[in-house]
């Protein structure tokens, strides 16, 4: 048998196994989600005090309007945009400017990336396209806070985890 045919057969077998593994992964998501959120909270606890003690502003970055939007038809997009906001804006800035906690913030980011990847693979959790006005407001406030924005955003990360948990728990039963 030619080598290319053997490789093609191997690819077909591997891709079907991968596809069924991904489906199984989504079937068990409701049982693994609490552990993923617990790991996210544990990773955040290692930097929580650092950022919250440096947050001297009374400005609210994350409030109940985000939770309400997560519960609305835009929930999927709001969650997707908030994860992107933390991964692409907040955490890189926190790692760059706060060398004392760089490694811990990096670890927190990796856990959030793993959760995002899992959510994207299981389409029923993130099947969305519309833009979120609340997340836009969060981003605008973050930018207005300039240097203090990173402390505010990282200090509020636990609120975001709680809201994310509510959104995901609401969708597991569907």
From Swiss-Prot:
Record key words, sorted: Cytokine, Disulfide bond, Glycoprotein, Secreted, Signal
GO CC, any one term: extracellular space
Signal sequence region: 1-16
GO terms for biological process, alphabetical: immune response; regulation of cytokine production
Main subcellular location of this protein, as a coarse class: secreted
UniProt keyword Disulfide bond present: yes
Disulfide-linked positions: 26-122, 76-128
Family that this chain belongs to: Belongs to the IL-10 family.
Name under which the protein is recorded: Interleukin-10
Taxonomic classification: Eukaryota, Metazoa, Chordata, Craniata, Vertebrata
């Amino acid at each position: 048998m030619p080598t290319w045919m053997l490789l093609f057969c191997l690819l077909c077998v591997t891709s079907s196994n991968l596809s069924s593994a991904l489906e199984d992964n989504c079937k068990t998501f409701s049982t693994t989600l609490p552990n993923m959120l617990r790991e996210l909270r544990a990773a955040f606890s290692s930097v929580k005090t650092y950022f919250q003690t440096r947050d001297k502003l009374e400005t609210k970055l994350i409030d109940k309007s985000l939770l309400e939007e997560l519960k609305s038809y835009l929930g999927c997009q709001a969650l997707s945009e908030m994860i992107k906001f933390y991964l692409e804006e907040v955490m890189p800035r926190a790692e760059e400017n706060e060398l004392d906690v760089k490694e811990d913030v990096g670890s927190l980011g990796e856990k959030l990336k793993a959760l995002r990847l899992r959510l994207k693979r299981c389409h029923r959790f993130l099947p969305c396209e519309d833009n979120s006005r609340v997340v836009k407001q969060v981003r605008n406030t973050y930018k207005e806070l300039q240097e203090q924005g990173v402390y505010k955003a990282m200090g509020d990360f636990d609120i975001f985890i709680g809201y994310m948990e509510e959104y995901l728990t609401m969708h597991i039963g569907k």
